[in-house]
Amino acid sequence: KILKFSKKLGVNIIKRPLSLCKDDSSSESAIKNVLDNLSFRVDNIIFLQVTSPLREPSDIDKAYRRLISTKSDSIFSCHKAEDYFEIWSKKGNKEKYIPITIDYKNRKPRQLFKEDHFMANGSIFIFKKEILSKFNNRLGGKINVYEMEEWQSLQLDDIKQINAMEILFKNKLKKFYV
C-alpha cells in the first residue's frame, strides 16, 4: 500500500532487500543500499530518524549550514543536557551493574563540571558520503553537533511516548504542521 501510494506521488522508490529488513539490520546498511541504487552522485547524506520527528521546518537547513560552515564531516542533532545523567548498564541476568557515564570512585560535584554536555536526540544526522564508506558509520571525521530544544528530543518508541507526543502536538506543534 505504501509503495503504491508513493508511486502515485512520483516518489523514486528503492526497495530494500529482505536481508536488510531484519531487526538487527543497521540504518547504515539501508543507506548504502540506497546509494548503490541511485542514478546520480551524492556528496552529503541527510538522514532523518522517523522515531525522532520533532524538527521545526528550518532545523534541517540550519543543521546542513552548520555542517558546511564548520567544515565538519558529520553532524548530529542534540540538546544541551542541563543535568548530568549517571547511566549504568546491567550485566547479564546477574545483579551486577557497570557505570557507563561516570567514574563513581572519583565522583566530583556537578557544580565542578565546566564543559557543556549534550544528549544526542536522533532527529537529524548529516554526513559526507565518504564518512559512511570509510567508517561504515554515519559519524566520523570531524564530528559536530546541531543543538535543538530539549522538547524536540522526545522519541516515538512506545505507547507512553506516543501519548506524550500527542499532548505536545496539541499544545506546541500544531502551528508547524497544520
Each language-model region and where it sits:
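Residue-level signal for well-ordered alpha-helical positions
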Residues: 8-9, 138, 168
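Hydrophobic helical membrane-anchoring modules
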Residues: 134, 145-178
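Conserved core of the sugar-phosphate nucleotidyltransferase
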Residues: 24-29, 53-149
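Histidine-centered beta-alpha loop that forms part of the nucleotide-sugar donor binding/catalytic region
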Residues: 18, 49, 79-80
